[in-house]
Design a protein with these regions (language model features):
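Aromatic-rich carbohydrate-recognition surfaces in CAZymes
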Residues: 1-98, 118
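Catalytic cores of carbohydrate-active enzymes
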Residues: 92, 98-155
């Protein structure tokens, strides 16, 4: 996994009823990561933000041309898109659950965070190639990776 692991781990725990942590503090961190691009590699290494977030928000997926500098694999745009979409879904569910719990957190419906995250949660669809039915690399122009392009493999 190459995305934002804290959101899926903390969100899953909270939804399942594990509450031995400060969910408000956790939510602050999860929201910061979901909406912030790290300015430097050092910030990313220290767990701040999502890499390639600007492309993810601009296109609704991370295009193949957007290789992530200093990543273990520079060709992980599809995996990163899928994980970010999953993380956005999990965070939206946490916000919705907080809305109906005794735990305090600002109303996500009023701030638009829930709706924004649910829109982003559907971005996984943008890397599903309708002609193959598989998640596949996609270029910034909207075209999908072809067999001829497979000499340079993307995940």
């Amino acid at each position: 996994m190459i995305g934002d692991h804290c959101i899926s781990a903390l969100g899953d725990a909270y939804i399942k009823g594990i509450r031995n942590f400060d969910i408000n503090k956790a939510c602050e961190g999860m929201l910061r990561n979901a909406f912030r691009t790290p300015a430097t590699y050092e910030e990313y290494k220290n767990g701040m933000g999502r890499r390639a977030l600007n492309s993810y928000l601009k296109y609704g997926y991370i295009p193949l041309e957007d290789s992530v500098p200093e990543a273990f694999h520079t060709c992980e745009q599809v995996s990163r898109t899928l994980e970010y979409a999953y993380d956005d879904f999990v965070l939206a569910q946490v916000l919705q659950k907080l809305e109906t719990s005794d735990d305090y957190f600002p109303d996500p419906q009023k701030t638009g965070l829930y709706d924004t995250l649910m829109i982003r949660a559907r971005y996984y669809r943008n890397v599903i190639n309708p002609s193959t039915g598989y998640a596949q690399g996609r270029y910034a122009d909207g075209s999908f990776l072809t067999d001829a392009d497979n000499a340079f493999s993307f995940t």
